[in-house]
Amino acid sequence: MASAAVQNKTPRKVLKKSTRDSLIAYSFIAPNFIGFCVFTLVPMVFAIALAFCAWDGRHAIEFIGLKNFVKLFTTDKIFQAALKNTVVYVIGTVPLTLACSLAMAVLLNQNVKLRNFFRTVAFFPYVASLVAVAAVWNMIFNPSMGPINMILNQFFGVAVENLPRWAAGKDTAMITVILFSVWKNMGYYMVIYLAGLQGCNPDLNEAAELDGANRWQQFWHITLPQLRPTTFFVVIMLTISGFKVYDQMYMITQGGPGTATMTLVYYIYNVAFVNTPKYGYASAISMVLFVLVLLVTIIQFRGSKGDN
């Protein structure tokens, strides 16, 4: 009788403990989940719905169907310029940042003197205030008094009228922003590559060296293939951040001169918050940006599976 009573009580105790553990787990998850719903999911759904409407924040929301999207791809020249500039920025920053960060990681992965010091120096631009480094960058690349143009003029004989105008020039503004972004971010991705290099198998390099492979052959055929997961992560992160670029444009060029450095996110900001607000139209641009990033990411994932 006693053993039967114990057996009947045991499942209840297990059930109560399981329920209590589940409640504890949900209590930890709930704050983050609620925050995600309130600050991410609900605004995203509202933005999708708003993309098919006209709304200035003061009058009633008016449903207009696909008119916002039709206007984007037919008559809005600024949007088309912003889309082109965003793609150019991504194409310029992703391979340059990738190559520079990988090169620095390989160099600073060696047993050299002051290695930790140089790692810190390389990482510093990433953690430095964007406002401060942008001000310094504008001073260095000042068309009139910047040291870069002074060096070009005095040591390389470039005439004053032929000196590049950098951020102030329509043809050089995007190049200036791309160079700034590469310099600002390559330290962060260098650290990621350093972590990837620490996971590479040194025995493979030693075996290849015994077979007569030089340093370049070892890097290209042994080290680089082992870094494929790291490289894939870096490319994804650089691509997404490239499509979302805003801060650099705002601090260095303000989207100019003209629309030379106007990007999609900067244009979204202007449409939504500058002059007369057009929240529906800005939401439509956001949806185009979302779909563009999603398509590029899917293509990259499929390409990565093919490589594997």
Residue map of PLM features:
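A structural signal for multi-pass alpha-helical bundles of membrane permease subunits
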Residues: S18-N308
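Short, Lys/Arg-rich, polar N-terminal cytosolic tail immediately upstream
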Residues: M1-T19
